[in-house]
């Protein structure tokens, strides 16, 4: 079996092209765990997860990337957020019936792809592109050509391995400020396109790379672990409560006896009673109870 949920970066010695290979099956399972999405939505979230992991690995600084799809289709939102430590989380919102064979256009309808890059230090950048491609990979390749002017190819696979959800993918990209020959890039893309889903899901990364590129000279760097990680906390919820008008919070307490805040990403509930709210209003630290 492959070492799942790892990202491998690699470099071609004879071409100005770099690559990435990632498997994210366990992380995908955890993202889906607290939700009952229709199968096409699950699949698209898996594709988004693979893509976000690959894109996050292109960052040259500490920060995070959010990749989201928005539209007027039955899936109004799908979003994956990841940081340079390959800590990922994601969620989708569905309104209306989703056909069992729904593709990207059917799910999103008239919509667009938004990529937000947020460095820990420096200015936030946001790029928006229409969904002109038939697949998520095609839309992202279009984004790179428009915004970065870097020829980029993504190869995304989702499915099952041993009865469990499995997802992985690969990225090829011309190195910035390098003049890679189009024929060279297309040659490597043609090789990479032959990757089979079951190979990606079940073989060690080095075996996959050897099968694809055994006639090329490739340097493979140490892998980086990929994991599901939610950034929600009781303190963040308390900060959000501080921004609400006193009357609104008082009304919730009067009607429900407590304020129950739910994280869409991980399913955790943070419950605040009247004493907690009073403490928050005085800037005191709320107590610890939370419910998964």
Curated annotation (Swiss-Prot):
Alphabetical UniProt keywords: Chaperone, Cytoplasm, Disulfide bond, Redox-active center, Zinc
Source superkingdom: Bacteria
GO MF, any single term: unfolded protein binding
Entry keyword annotation includes Zinc: yes
Principal subcellular localisation of the protein: cytoplasm
InterPro entries reported for this sequence: Heat_shock_Hsp33, Heat_shock_Hsp33_C, Heat_shock_Hsp33_N, Hsp33_helix_hairpin_bin_dom_sf
Record has Disulfide bond as a keyword: yes
PTM entry text: Under oxidizing conditions two disulfide bonds are formed involving the reactive cysteines. Under reducing conditions zinc is bound to the reactive cysteines and the protein is inactive.
Compartmental location: Cytoplasm
UniProt cross-references to HAMAP family, sorted A to Z: HslO
Function of the protein: Redox regulated molecular chaperone. Protects both thermally unfolding and oxidatively damaged proteins from irreversible aggregation. Plays an important role in the bacterial defense system toward oxidative stress.
Family: Belongs to the HSP33 family.
Protein name (database record): 33 kDa chaperonin
Organism (species): Cronobacter sakazakii (strain ATCC BAA-894) (Enterobacter sakazakii)
């Amino acid at each position: 079996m492959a070492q799942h949920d790892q990202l491998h970066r690699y470099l071609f010695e004879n071409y100005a092209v770099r690559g990435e290979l990632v498997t994210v099956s366990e992380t995908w399972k955890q993202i889906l765990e607290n939700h009952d999405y229709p199968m096409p939505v699950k699949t698209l979230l898996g594709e988004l997860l693979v893509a976000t992991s690959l894109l996050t690995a292109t960052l040259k600084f500490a920060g995070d990337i959010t990749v989201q799809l928005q539209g007027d289709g039955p899936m109004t939102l799908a979003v994956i957020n990841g940081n340079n430590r390959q800590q990922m989380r994601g969620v989708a919102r569905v309104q209306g019936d989703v056909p069992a064979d729904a593709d990207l256009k059917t799910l999103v309808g008239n919509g667009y792809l938004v990529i937000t890059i947020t460095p820990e230090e420096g200015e936030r950048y946001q790029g928006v592109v229409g969904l002109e491609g038939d697949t998520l990979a095609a839309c992202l390749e279009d984004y790179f050509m428009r915004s970065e002017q870097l020829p980029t190819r993504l190869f995304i696979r989702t499915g099952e391995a041993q009865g469990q959800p499995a997802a992985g993918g690969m990225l090829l990209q011309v190195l910035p400020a390098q003049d890679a020959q189009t024929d060279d890039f297309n040659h490597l893309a043609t090789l990479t396109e032959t990757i089979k889903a079951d190979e990606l899901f079940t073989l060690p990364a080095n075996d996959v790379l050897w099968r694809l590129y055994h006639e090329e000279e490739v340097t493979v760097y140490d892998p980086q672990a990929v994991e599901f990680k939610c950034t929600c906390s009781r303190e963040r919820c308390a900060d959000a409560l501080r921004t609400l008008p006193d009357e609104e919070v008082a009304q919730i307490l009067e009607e429900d006896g407590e304020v129950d805040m739910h994280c869409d990403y991980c399913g955790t509930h943070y419950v605040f009673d009247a004493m907690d709210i009073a403490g928050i209003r005085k800037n005191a630290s709320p107590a610890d109870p939370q419910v998964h």
